[in-house]
UniProtKB/Swiss-Prot annotation:
Self-associates. Interacts with HES1 and HEYL. Interacts with HDAC1, NCOR1 and SIN3A. Interacts with GATA4 and GATA6. Interacts with CCDC89/BOIP. Residues 49-104 form the bHLH domain. It comes from Homo sapiens. The gene is HEY1. Belongs to the HEY family. Residues 1-52, 196-234 are annotated as: Disordered. This is Hairy/enhancer-of-split related with YRPW motif protein 1. Residues 28-47, 200-210 have a biased composition (Polar residues). GO terms for biological process: angiogenesis; aortic valve morphogenesis; arterial endothelial cell differentiation; atrioventricular valve formation; cardiac conduction system development; cardiac epithelial to mesenchymal transition; cardiac septum morphogenesis; cardiac ventricle morphogenesis. It is found in: Nucleus. It comes from the Eukaryota.
Length: 304
């Protein structure tokens, strides 16, 4: 009686593939010697190459995830504001991103491509960071405690300014782009009265702007004690910069830097301009002021 030979079905081949997978997984777990002992050198090199490629792909995937999370942490305002105080987890960054996108969607969808609104948001965050740095400077460097009246008045003034700017930016959010000059009281296409070019012979080459009397009245009311800041009534501005009397004394780099200040967004009413006597080397008070630190905010704090 003949003995029947066993027939190998498809289940047997699947069992062989399972054994090969188990050998490969055992190789990944560290049992390299036992797994490679029954394999040819070609098979073992293929397994090692496949394992190496898998590690490289996994590392690149993790790097892409980490880079994307870093970009989200920088782009989302709430995450950007919080990143200096504590380390953010990946779940927190993703949650803040979802909340920010929901807020933009609730606002009507205009915030996705509104670069001005995004810039105003970052400007508010930057101002808050600078305010915190000022408070740290006053406490650490200047040695002023929290109850010092100078520190209290300065910090409260900056807080009020930040709140007013945030409220103003929120009120004008639906009016489109607001130029920097209109925010601070003058138009960006008109140079500031203190920085307009002057003519040494007293005749102006261009006609006076209709907004010049308005600026002159503002300058006169802001600085009644400084006659050099008042423009002459003849229509030409004359010498409005008391620091230098002619443009020939300025070097070309300084002239270019002064010309670039016409687009500076902040008002010049909060800064005192120096007189020529203060810049002369023979001033009697120069030697007495050498040992004192320069603190312009200490003299201006009374106006807050």
């Amino acid at each position: 009686m003949k003995r029947a030979h066993p027939e190998y079905s498809s289940s047997d081949s699947e069992l062989d593939e399972t054994i090969e997978v188990e050998k490969e997984s055992a190789d990944e777990n560290g049992n390299l010697s036992s797994a490679l002992g029954s394999m040819s050198p070609t098979t073992s090199s293929q397994i090692l190459a496949r394992k190496r490629r898998r590690g490289i792909i996994e590392k690149r995937r993790r790097d892409r995830i980490n880079n994307s999370l870093s970009e989200l942490r920088r782009l989302v305002p709430s995450a950007f504001e919080k990143q200096g105080s504590a380390k953010l987890e990946k779940a927190e960054i993703l949650q803040m991103t979802v909340d920010h996108l929901k807020m933009l969607h609730t606002a009507g969808g205009k915030g996705y491509f509104d670069a001005h609104a995004l810039a105003m948001d970052y400007r508010s965050l930057g101002f808050r960071e600078c305010l915190a740095e000022v408070a740290r400077y006053l406490s650490i460097i200047e040695g002023l405690d929290a109850s010092d009246p100078l520190r209290v008045r300065l910090v409260s003034h900056l807080n009020n300014y930040a709140s007013q700017r945030e409220a103003a930016s929120g009120a004008h959010a639906g009016l489109g782009h607001i130029p920097w000059g209109t925010v601070f009281g003058h138009h960006p296409h008109i140079a500031h009265p203190l920085l307009l070019p002057q003519n040494g012979h007293g005749n102006a080459g261009t006609t006076a702007s209709p907004t010049e009397p308005h600026h002159q009245g503002r300058l006169g009311s802001a600085h009644p004690e400084a006659p050099a800041l008042r423009a002459p009534p003849s229509g030409s501005l004359g010498p409005v910069l008391p620091v230098v009397t002619s443009a020939s004394k300025l070097s070309p780099p300084l002239l270019s830097s002064v010309a670039s200040l016409s687009a500076f967004p902040f008002s010049f009413g909060s800064f005192h301009l120096l007189s020529p006597n203060a810049l002369s080397p023979s001033a009697p008070t120069q030697a007495a002021n050498l040992g004192k630190p320069y603190r312009p905010w200490g003299t201006e704090i009374g106006a807050f």
